Structures are given as structure tokens and as C-alpha cells.
Amino acid sequence: MPEDRPIEDSPPIGEAQTDAPAGGCPAGFGRIKPPVAGGSNRDWWPNQLNLKILQKNPDVINPLDEDFDYRSAVQNLDVDALRADIVEVMHTSQDWWPADFGHYGPLFIRMAWHAAGTYRVSDGRGGAGAGMQRFAPLNSWPDNASLDKARRLLWPVKKKYGKNLSWADLIVYAGNVALEDMGFRTAGFAFGREDRWEPEEDVYWGPEQEWLDDKRYTGERDLENPLAAVQMGLIYVNPEGPNGNPDPQASAIDIRETFGRMAMNDVETAALIVGGHTFGKTHGNGDASLVGPEPEAAPLEEVGLGWRNPQGTGVGKDAITSGLEVTWTHTPTKWDNSFLEILYGNEWELTKSPAGANQWKPKDNGWANSVPLAHEDGKTHPSMLTSDLALRVDPIYEQITRRWLDHPEELAEEFAKAWFKLLHRDMGPVTRYLGPEVPKDTWLWQDNIPAGNDLSDDEVAKLKELIADSGLTVSQLVSTAWKAASTFRSSDLRGGANGGRIRLQPQLGWEANEPDELAQVVRKYEEIQKASGINVSFADLVVLGGNVGVEKAAKAAGFDVTVPFTPGRGDATQEETDVDSFAYLEPKADGFRNYLGKGSDLPAEFKLIDRANLLGLSAPEMTTLVGGLRVLDVNHGGTKHGVLTDKPGALTTDFFVNLLDMSTAWKPSPADDGTYIGTDRATGSPKWTGTRVDLVFASNSQLRALAEVYAEDDSKEKFVKDFVAAWTKVMDADRFDVA
């Protein structure tokens, strides 16, 4: 993170800096309308549901061959040769962007840090796992200024290894190699991140419309969820201090909040700051207001680069990235303990960078002429950021870092672990880690699951019979499997039924999981598990039970189906489960079961789309699951909202048929609780009740089109088939151990 303050006075997001006259439109500049007729639907109806997020990364935009499998290809990578090529790049300074101190390592560390550091634990979004730093908005965030050059420096490496090395892997591996080349011993590295080919449109980065604006706080300093940065376009905190106020203690509050929101504790936070700021420098040797537009707003001739600096050479000693001009240590390309030695070896006074940014220098000319200049002979004094001094003034951070001052080996160990966590937090379980540098050590945050057992066809058949005869209802079987599997997040590949954590805390006590009823079902499954004499995991039993429920429901609707089942799930223990970390997976809403928790900040139908998105579902898959789960009577609390059938427990198309029936008139409930009453249009007698999630399948034009398909007379068998396919997709979403 050696460069983490954005350029001030940036234009509004998406708007280029230009001298175009009012009303004029010089070619390639200004705010021009794309070649489409009129505004988009979103312009006309800004509150419209965005179903496009349910069709992310379609195959049609992927230029690679249909049968190409990156996770297989990357295992053929010559990692030693790749490492050597990255090292050569780091030591070969280019005139178009000269290396600070003759080494691009610190720049690559910052690139990797800022790629991974967008991760946030609340919804699992962000992170380095898909190479999103290449695309807007991240490629143009003020905090990512000059990282366009870092990626461009690595293009010859990417070009050489082609499709066998993703940008997502290369960006973070280059940072890892940089640390090791400068003398640090990392904990290892895992390959396996697959590139995507379009920006992520489903990530909420904040309400602001201008870079560095701050409209995300309420109260004294309450940061809006799920955000994990203090201003639009920053990765974490403003290194000058909150909103530029150079108050180290206030900065410590922001640091703890933002790093905590990306799953780092105090020790990990301190280690990342100290370790990252052991290397390199920041850039602010000039007037930051003169720097050109970011890559997405830059003219075509910049060929994807941005932030052109017209002052002096514009690069090297004249470079401007953050507006801060700080070199922390006298050995900026070597791992040592000098950052802490300098931080605690001086008293500090506030000063200004050449760009006018708040930073700190030693009092009384301390450590004068001890820090090298990056691009010319001579030396200067060290400098610090407000966020650096926070480590010294905050009592908790001070206790941690003062110990490291005397025990640098402990700092090295903690930084290695925290850096590995930073780069791999969004990769999912260790079964997804690939390559020769995967560490043997495992950590609690990886949500580790012991290997499960295979089951024979006869064993599966016996277990299904025991479940069917257990007295558990279709609703109990299906809802329990859904509660377990639907915790899965495609964003960071956490959650899911594997591990059997539905029987453990915190999931066993979640309000959304109806703890009293869930405890009864868990006990029944444990009885079956013991009585069967079969070495079956609790996790497998829950999914198999859900399948039994679906098969029963299909038979009640007149169809004999066998729901696909792949055994092999393992059972985690309570000791292998980080209760605090898993708490972030607790559903605040689950439209599939008509559950809406207290204090929801969005209408229920928007929450449904978000949950379907995290589950990796398409709009048709979401539609079939909602319609099917309604008639299977699995609503939270046993409510009858949306159970539009007189045959609950049968997998029929009744939800769609009755929802679209024009003999029913709907109106809001007098209770004003977000529910609706459906009455007979002729007699006025009540027929049904529903929620916003139910009625949206008749109200939204796209969802209605899907609902109509399943309401048609010839769709009964198709619906059962489609429901089973979507159900199986959710049940197996976390099965990274099988093809």
C-alpha cells in the first residue's frame, strides 16, 4: 500500500478534464452520448430492478475457446521461469516510467495490495480474484493512480505466458515475488484466479457521484454497510487523516473500521501497514491539480493509460500519484525493521508535500540525509503519513508495534500471514489453491472442511429410505437443505452446505434459520446418521434429505424424478468454525423463503435479486426456485404469503398460475407491513396473501415474462425439470472438490 492518497480536484466520475467550450464536443473529449437512441430504461425508471446482474460474464464475451479450462492450464505453468521473468522486469527500468530506486518491486506490491484490498467481508465482493483492477471503476479510482503503469510493465510477461496465466493471478503474484526479491519470506502463493471479461456491475461502491466525495457516514462516524473505504475512490482510509484532517488518533479509528470490514484484526492490520510501508515511496512532487484524467476518461492516444502529468518530465522525480511525497525508510527496496525504528525513533511535526498534502517529518531535523532520493543522487529525511502515526498514538496498535520494534521476527511472521490472507481471502477453500507454492499451513479464516466419504448407490438408497420414513415433512426436509446451501456466496466462495455447519454456531442460532425447529431437525438427522450404520457426513445427509423432499413433492405433482446427488461432503467442527467471521453470512433477507429481517435498507424484491446474484443464479433459475419453494410451503415462520396453491407440498406450477390469474385483485394489506391481499375480483372475498417478492413476478415485465412460461398449460413437466436443475445447482455450489 505504499501509495494510498488520491489526487485531489479530480473531475466528477466518468467526466474527462477538457477545455471544450460549453455545448461543444471536440472529438474524443468531454461528456458525449453513446450512439444509441435516447436514454436507457434505467434513465427513465431509475428504481427498476436490475436483472442484468443475474447474467454476468456470459460466454459470448469470453474470447477463449469454449473448452479452455484455466484451472487446468495454469497447472502447466513454469512457475520458476515466470518468477525469473517478473524479477527481470522489476530490475529493468523503463524510460517511459522509471523505477523508483531502480526497482519496480514497491510498485508491484501496491498493485497487488490494491487489487486484493477491495475485498469486504460483509458481502464477499471485491478482491483480486477476477482481475477487476483492469476495468472501470477500479482502473480509474484516484487511489489506483499509476497502477496502470504497473500493469503495463507486466504486459510482456502476460503476453509471453498467454492464456495459461491470468491477469488476476499475475497482478497479485507479481506483488508476492516483489516482496521475496527484496528479502522478505512470504507464506507462499496459490494460483487459480480466473479472469473475467467485463466490469462487475453488481458491486455497490458508495452513493457519491464525484471522486473522493464522502456521503457514506451518518451519526458521529457510522460507515454505511457494506462499504469498507472512507471515501469514493479510496481502498481503505485517507492517509492524510479523515477527510484530510491530519489527526492520527482519528485516523486510527478509520483504520480499525475499514480494515475490520475486510476481515483483518488489529495485529493483521498493523502488520500490513508496517510491512507495506517498509518499501518504496509516494509521489507528490508538483501541483496535483494539473494531472490529466484517469484512464477511462483519457483521450484515445493515451491507449489505456491515464493521469498524464505535464510538469517537468512527468515521470521519475516529477511523478505525481497521490500528492504525498513520502519515503519511509533508508532502505526502500529491502525488508528490514527500519519503518518502526524510524517511526519510534523520532518525534514528528506536520508539514506539507510539494502538492500541498498533509504529511509528517521528524522534529529538529531528525534523521536528516538518511533516506535516498529515488531518481537522483543525494539524500533527504524520512517522512510519515498521518495513518502511519496512528500506529503510534492508538494504544492497541502501539502495544503491537512497539513489541515488533524489539522482536522483528514476530513482525515478519505476522506480515507473512496477513499478506497471504489479503491475497487469498476471496479464493474460497484450500481445495481451490493451485501451484507449487501453496503452503502446508492452514488457518481458521479459510473455513477448512475435512474430506468426506464416498457412498455406494445402495448406501444412498438406504439413507433415502430412512429419511423418507423419519417423520420429517417435505417442508422440513427442503427448508433445512436450503438454509444450509443458500449461505453460499459466489463473491468470495464462502458458505454452502459442505461442512455441515448448519448444526453449529452461529448458524444454528440465526433467526432466519428458525432455531427451535432447526434444532429438532438436526437431532433427527443425527439419529438417522447413527442408526444407519453408514459412514455418512451430516452435510451429505442434509442435502440428501432435501433431495428426498423434492422427489416426494414432484411425485405428489405426478412426476417421478431422481434429484442428482454427489456424496463426499465433510463435516467441520465447532473449533474449525470462526463464529465471528461466519456471522457475516447470516441472511438479513431471503426472498426464496419470504423472509425479511428487521431494519432492511432495501425493498424485499431488491434483496431477492442480490441473494440470487450471490448464489450465482440466472433470472430463470431464480424464478423456478421461488415458485417451487412457495408451493413446497417452506416460508420462514410458516407464513402462507405467496403459497398460492391448495396442494402445498406438491411441486406444481400453481404459484405462477394463480399469481397471473386476472380473477384475483391485489391490494396492500391494511397492516402496512409490506404484504398484500388477493381477493376475488367478482365477490371481494379473500383468496391469497403475498409479499413484494411474490408480486414482483407479476409486476416486473421481465420477471412476468418468465412467470408466464411456467404458468402455461404445457409447462408442468418443464417446471419440475427446471426446478430440479436449479435446486441441484444451489446444493452443489460449494463442491469445488468435484468437476
From Swiss-Prot:
GO terms for biological process: cellular response to hydrogen peroxide; hydrogen peroxide catabolic process. It catalyses: H2O2 + AH2 = A + 2 H2O; 2 H2O2 = O2 + 2 H2O. Residues 1-33 are annotated as: Disordered. It holds the Pfam family peroxidase. Binds 1 heme b (iron(II)-protoporphyrin IX) group per dimer. The record marks R110 as: Transition state stabilizer. The active site is at H114. There is a cross-link at Y236-M262 (Tryptophyl-tyrosyl-methioninium (Tyr-Met) (with W-113)). GO terms for cellular component: cytosol. There is a cross-link at W113-Y236 (Tryptophyl-tyrosyl-methioninium (Trp-Tyr) (with M-262)). Its cofactor is heme b. Signal peptide: none annotated. Its EC number is 1.11.1.21. CDD domains: catalase_peroxidase_1, catalase_peroxidase_2. Gene3D superfamilies: 1.10.520.10, Peroxidase, domain 2 (1.10.420.10). PANTHER family: CATALASE-PEROXIDASE, HYDROPEROXIDASE I, BIFUNCTIONAL CATALASE-PEROXIDASE. Homodimer or homotetramer. This is Catalase-peroxidase 1. The gene is katG1.
